[in-house]
Amino acid sequence: MTKLIVICGATATGKSSLALALAMRLGSVIISADSRQVYRKFDIGTAKPTVAEQKLVPHYLIDICDPTDTMTVADYQEQTQALIASVDVTPLLLVGGTGLYIRSIVQGMKIPRVAPQIELRSQLESLGQLQLYAMLQQVDPVAAQKIHANDSVRTLRALEVYYVTGCPISEQQGENPPNYPILQIGLDCDVEKLGNRIKQRTEQMIADGLVAEVEYLCQKYGADLSLLNTLGYQEIKQYLAGDISLDEAKELTILHTRQFAKRQRTWFRAYPQIEWFDANNPDLLDKIWLRINEFTNCTHSS
């Protein structure tokens, strides 16, 4: 019987290292739930598991897309559900900090299968967010009530789905939860300690060659590549352009990562099914191992 263990939480809480240790004990595999680790060549800045780590335990949904491709939540859900159904190992580990990816699996979100429409998006974006939101209120008032008036990304997506399918996105959404047992484990620590973790990790990324990685990606794909405008890459890109110093790029990365971690914590805390553990507890691995044994034994006996 399939069982799934989710390891989630904010960035820099140690999810990957914990998952690796657990997977080795369990003889299991790791399915990534990180929206940037799916892209090839984006390695250091995404804290992607190293080649050596990936040799220790099979990792899935890492390095599956070119940086010029687009991986939607619907794509991720489809591939992950197929993996869970086909991999002959249990329990499986789903690990990452991309909340929508995790939610798409554990809650079985129904997601409209509408690929990004570049020309349509361009036409809509030219109208401005104020007009777009007014249009959404007319064609899909239910979705408009759930989307903030300044949320241009979700407004655009809702209109895109409506104009492609002729049906409001609110009527195409819902949930179809999986029928297998799921244990959701969250890692967290206090703000000051998380800030120190983020600082140390940022410094390590730079020491590991983040500047050279960004320089290579800019040369190969062009500085306008959308992924290069994401956390950790956009700041180094500013440094390479001569706009800021490397120290300033580092401090900006730390600041932006802390802000991102705050948003992640808010997202995950909204889900009561997640069982929280202190990432700085020296007995963390043993405590979670005990909880996993309870989970696997309970679901096996039932």
From Swiss-Prot:
GO BP annotation list: tRNA modification
UniProt site positions, description: Interaction with substrate tRNA: 98
Single annotated GO MF: ATP binding
Alphabetical UniProt keywords: ATP-binding, Magnesium, Nucleotide-binding, Transferase, tRNA processing
Record: residues binding substrate: 11-16
Cofactor(s) the record lists: Mg(2+)
SUPFAM superfamilies, alphabetized: P-loop containing nucleoside triphosphate hydrolases (SSF52540)
Enzyme category, top tier: transferase
Residue ranges, annotated region (Interaction with substrate tRNA): 34-37
HAMAP family associated with the record: IPP_trans (MF_00185)
Function summary: Catalyzes the transfer of a dimethylallyl group onto the adenine at position 37 in tRNAs that read codons beginning with uridine, leading to the formation of N6-(dimethylallyl)adenosine (i(6)A).
Oligomer and partners: Monomer.
Protein name: tRNA dimethylallyltransferase
Organism: Nostoc punctiforme (strain ATCC 29133 / PCC 73102)
